[in-house]
Each structure stands twice: as C-alpha cells, then as structure tokens.
Amino acid sequence: MNGRDEALRGVPRFSLCLPACGREIAVEVLLLKPGVHVSIYDGDAPHIGAVAIIDPAGSLMVNEFPGHRDGVICRHWADRFNAERFHPAVIECGIHYDGITREGIQEVVSVTDDMLEVVVQRIASVLIEPNQS
C-alpha cells in the first residue's frame, strides 16, 4: 500500500456517474474531518476549469480559469453546500464536450443539478450534524 492509499484509508467517499450528451459525467466526493471535497468532470476532455472554496465560516470564492465556463456549475454547487452548511468545502469542475450545442449545455446543467441533489442527500445521510462553524 502506498502513502496515498494509507492516507485515504477510512475516509468516507462515494462517486456517482450519470449520462449526458452521450458520455458520462462523474462526481467523486470525499468527506473529510471537517470538510467536503468534490470533483465533477468528464466529457471529451476532463480537466479543472473552475474551483469553488467555502471556508469554515461559510465565505465563498469561485475561481474560473480563462476560457472556461465551469464556474457556473461550481457556484451552483457551492451555494447549495453553503445553504446546507457543508463547509469547509472545495468543489472543482471540468466538463468539456467538443462541439456542444446550447441544448447539450442545458442537458449537462440539468444532469449536474440532478447529481447535486443525490450528493446532498448522501452527505446529509453520512454526517451526524453539519459543521456549525
């Protein structure tokens, strides 16, 4: 077992994949003590296009890299996590589909909204009490 495997041993985590535009979007969640780390990615070129950070007090910051639009999804997830008091948290998103249409973008946003609902329910079921910092 390498050091990374050892470090993650015992950390609650789960993942979810749902289809969008002929591919799957993946979400991976790590429940840290305290904190939540979420990665949302896939499409034709999974990457990191935006990162949202919620500090322990609930202050929110979103950084979207130039040329990317992933901040919309990051902000939406971060706003919901903040409302649920799931902080501190880091949410990173990188979804890219070559030649995506406006309808395809709407499908990706809709699917990530559905995924958000599942993730919030899963986190709430694992946490005894959200961080009240």
Model regions and ranges:
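Conserved mixed alpha/beta catalytic, RNA-binding, or beta-rich assembly cores of soluble enzyme
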Residues: 8-84, 88-97, 102-126, 131-132
